[in-house]
Amino acid sequence: MLCAICNVSSGNCAEDCAYCTQSAHIKADIPKFKQKNLEQILNEAKIASKNYALGFCLVTSGLGLDDKKLEFICEAATMLRKETPNLMLIACNGSASYESLKELKKVGIFSYNHNLETSREFFPQICTTHSWDDRFNTNLNAKKAGLELCCGGIYGLGESQDDRLSFRASLKELNPFSSPINFFIPNPALKIKQPLLSTDEALEIIRDTAKTLPQCRIMVAGGREIVLGDRQYEILENGASAIVIGDYLTTSGEVASKDIEELRNRGFEFASQCH
């Protein structure tokens, strides 16, 4: 399964997540803009569809889904359901109430992405402006609203093996439809100063996640190209069944045509429906 990301709004986030270059607490050299227009979003959706993406995720920066943001995401989703009906729409808009998530469900959003990021115990070391429990509760709200969950996190922040076990146990409790795995990429502007994970450790993380969540679609996302390099397609032999195709929020991804060619050469077919 291939999924693409649309960075609807970028940067200037008031939260202090230590792994994120979109935080206004640091000065990272990233694109910053308030909001893409509907035409830009539609163009990206059409490109994603041509690249065999099944999922298309509408991502906004900031703490949560306020009324103004909700209205725009609903407008964008309504347009995309009409213009690109083959895409399964995912929303990633931060903390959200049950009532707001019900509105997303009504306009055809299939899944809500809100990552736990790491263990409950380790989270205070990487973020102080909101709590891990806020994230967990938003996922509960999404389930209650009838949305599928897309919930995962990021590895390589300095967390311990016990943290990883605790994190995956929490994911198992939520039982998400899909679970993205991101690998931390160092950036001089970030407070976290951790080296890249080794390729072998990254593949082990994927295997361990797949064992913990056997019914879940394990998606390898940010850091795939840099951490795994020329071994990146081994993820599909180690428990992953989905990848993000194209660019990420603030970093470039693998060239889509290369991913498509490499996957085809390995005998993979691209999913045309979520199941």
UniProtKB/Swiss-Prot annotation:
Domain Radical SAM core: residue ranges: 1-217
Sequence positions that bind [2Fe-2S] cluster: C57, C92, C150, R217
Gene3D superfamilies linked to this entry: Aldolase class I
Biological role: Catalyzes the conversion of dethiobiotin (DTB) to biotin by the insertion of a sulfur atom into dethiobiotin via a radical-based mechanism.
EC numbers on record: 2.8.1.6
Subunit structure, interactors included: Homodimer.
UniProt name for this protein: Biotin synthase
Cofactor, free-text remark: Binds 1 [4Fe-4S] cluster. The cluster is coordinated with 3 cysteines and an exchangeable S-adenosyl-L-methionine. Binds 1 [2Fe-2S] cluster. The cluster is coordinated with 3 cysteines and 1 arginine.
A biological-process GO annotation: biotin biosynthetic process
Main enzyme class: transferase
Recorded metabolic or biological pathway in which this protein acts: Cofactor biosynthesis; biotin biosynthesis; biotin from 7,8-diaminononanoate: step 2/2
Originating organism: Campylobacter fetus subsp. fetus (strain 82-40)
InterPro entries cross-referenced by the UniProt entry: Aldolase_TIM, BATS_dom, Biotin_synth/BioAB, Biotin_synthase, Elp3/MiaA/NifB-like_rSAM, rSAM
Residues given in the record as [4Fe-4S] cluster binding sites: C13, C17, C20
Substrates-to-products reaction catalysed: (4R,5S)-dethiobiotin + (sulfur carrier)-SH + 2 reduced [2Fe-2S]-[ferredoxin] + 2 S-adenosyl-L-methionine = (sulfur carrier)-H + biotin + 2 5'-deoxyadenosine + 2 L-methionine + 2 oxidized [2Fe-2S]-[ferredoxin]
Cofactor(s) recorded in Swiss-Prot or TrEMBL: [4Fe-4S] cluster; [2Fe-2S] cluster
Family statement drawn from the similarity comment of this UniProt entry: Belongs to the radical SAM superfamily. Biotin synthase family.
